[in-house]
């Protein structure tokens, strides 16, 4: 079975699982599929020498990638009821690059469960913190570079956030395979991380950032491995990137149009441009032939999604919604794996339908360099190693000619509470002009940036 045949079979099996076919757990891969997984090579002989993970912010699969053929996406034609029983249809956001002034959709631990609604996935407008912005969607032409990257490489359409909750808990999973909080908080943490495992095995590693280093939550512990976006570009150009690199975008600290993380109300054209620059730096560098680039999103941002997340092995007891030792994953994310080992055909894009989450990236790192799992989550068979999204039989080092992002364009700041400047997208059921949770989130990033600066991080 070659990779394309395997991915097609996985898509069919995954779809059957989601509809509760006999012998399947909701959203989980089938036993039959686990028996037909391709055999992974010896890690040291795999050809992979560099893994780069870039984590954007707050978009669901249907919202960003629902247009993609054969990927189980849905966009137009869905309707959701609000708290008054009125039906609202999903709508295109094309041309509205910031979503301003729609409210930053609720994606808190509690609000997410209103949207999830016991797996019915119909509560996005039953959450009173939301307006119609949360059921809007973008098309292929709105994110030309990222859309083309997805179609020329491998898209994961069953990659879920690690917890049904907000940014900080999910980003903690990205580094630690667990979280010690259910809310966005800058309280310091001491959780062991993948960086500790890499250091113990003398595997080179670095964390790169733009304006706020998330690793500052660990105090000064990881100051020595933290580098700037400019350094990432230089290292990629020279072929001196370490074995493992995680890269964060420019977080949307203010609604001033300068963020490139895709978090509302950042301009998605800025995010597309950032990802283009990341890919150019890697694919034009001397180490591209041995590199795997993973572009994921920390969580779904409260945007509509029709596929209910499955449960997976609990990493610890912080998430109290545990059923038979398993907790809910978050919603699906628009994730792409770009590498000579994941190249595809844009006329028939590769869709991988195995169940992944953020610990799948950690599993890939652990597999490649012989590291022990951090928690029961990344040790679990509930979640697959992202290596199964790769084809080791015939790497294709030729780089496709991908479209450039929309440039140049005018950056327009978004001010949520300016009366009279609101579009119909912000109409009922949300209150027009009401403050959204983005104000709290941006203040939090600002506080973390200040804390990092005091601890000596190169935040400028």
Regions found by a protein language model. Name each.
Residues 5-460:
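N-terminal pro-sequences and low-complexity stem/linker regions of secreted or lumenal proteins
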